[in-house]
């Protein structure tokens, strides 16, 4: 009796799986999902989209030094 129940369960499982295998084979991850440059907060070595081949530009020239206002006093 137990053998018939197990056999019936195996046959029913194969009948449920067959339409999904025939329809599309299965679902696969897009390779872009695993790319760390496409995730939020990419690492520094990743380039922004559309910036390939362009030279890097200096964004902010920060000059460390004293001014008349702060008199070389650093608060920190």
Swiss-Prot record:
What GO biological process terms are annotated to this protein in UniProt? calcium-mediated signaling; cell-cell signaling; regulation of growth
Q: Do the record's keywords include Magnesium?
A: no
| Signal peptide as annotated in the record | 1-22
Pfam families from the xrefs? Answer: RALF
Q: Which cysteines are joined by disulfide bonds?
A: 37-46, 66-72
Subcellular localization, as worded in the UniProt entry: Secreted
Q: Which GO terms describe its molecular function?
A: hormone activity
Function field: Cell signaling peptide that may regulate plant stress, growth, and development. Mediates a rapid alkalinization of extracellular space by mediating a transient increase in the cytoplasmic Ca(2+) concentration leading to a calcium-dependent signaling events through a cell surface receptor and a concomitant activation of some intracellular mitogen-activated protein kinases.
Tell me the protein's name.
Answer: Protein RALF-like 30
Q: Which organism is it from?
A: Arabidopsis thaliana (Mouse-ear cress)
**Corresponding gene?**
RALFL30
